[in-house]
């Protein structure tokens, strides 16, 4: 199991421009069984995604598809746990 902790690098106005695409990405990975839970941090400085993946390489591949990653919106800190 992994947790991705996202920290926004861009102003919230720019985050909001990519939010629907990010939500669509989340929906795809929930449907595939990759994601268990997700949501924004409070205060709104980023988000958290709990995911099920076979390896860190698989996590990196999934994160590479996130519009927030593609557009330089967020940094990702990945934590593996058992």
Language-model segments: which ranges?
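Conserved, structured core segments of small domains
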Residues: 1-82
């Amino acid at each position: 199991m992994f947790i991705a902790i996202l920290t926004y690098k861009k102003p919230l106005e720019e985050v909001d421009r990519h939010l629907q695409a990010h939500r669509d990405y989340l929906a795809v990975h929930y449907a595939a069984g990759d994601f268990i839970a997700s949501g924004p941090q409070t205060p709104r400085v980023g988000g958290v995604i709990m995911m099920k993946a076979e390896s860190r390489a698989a996590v990196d591949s999934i994160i590479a598809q996130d519009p927030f990653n593609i557009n330089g919106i967020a940094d990702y800190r990945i934590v593996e746990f058992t």
